[in-house]
Amino acid sequence: MLKVQHWLQREDARNVDLATMAAQAGLGERTFLRRFQQATGMRPTEYCQQLRAAKARELLELTNRSVDQIAWEVGYQDPAAFRKVFNKMVGLSPTDYRRRFDRRNAQQG
């Protein structure tokens, strides 16, 4: 499962589906699902969302890109869906997260 996790991190968890992940692991889809969940405690989709949210947090902290640009960069086709998922996972909207954790100003001071 580590091989798949590292692969997902390199791919930024974008445009991946169950069949592709299972193939990366050399397993059938059902076996992959079971083993992935045992290894990580999450379904593959949840794990991918976590990776994408982590990348989004980094971009919000370190860049001036708009929330929509960040949504597209981390693999969301719909910025509204990104905002909803981000808020659910992080507990703050992307805009509120940026206000609270913006590291660009801290690095300049």
Which positions does each model-derived feature cover?
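Alpha-helical ds-nucleic-acid-binding substructure associated with the helix-hairpin-helix region
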Residues: 24
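Short hydrophobic/aromatic patch on the recognition helix
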Residues: 32, 36, 81-82, 86
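Nucleic acid-binding interface residues in structured DNA/RNA-binding domains
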Residues: 87, 92-95
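Surface-exposed beta-strand edges and their flanking turn/coil or helix-capping segments
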Residues: 30-31, 73, 91
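Terminal helix-turn-helix DNA-binding modules in bacterial transcription factors
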Residues: 6, 14-19, 27, 37-78, ...
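Key DNA-contact positions within bacterial/archaeal DNA-binding proteins
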Residues: 30, 79-80, 95
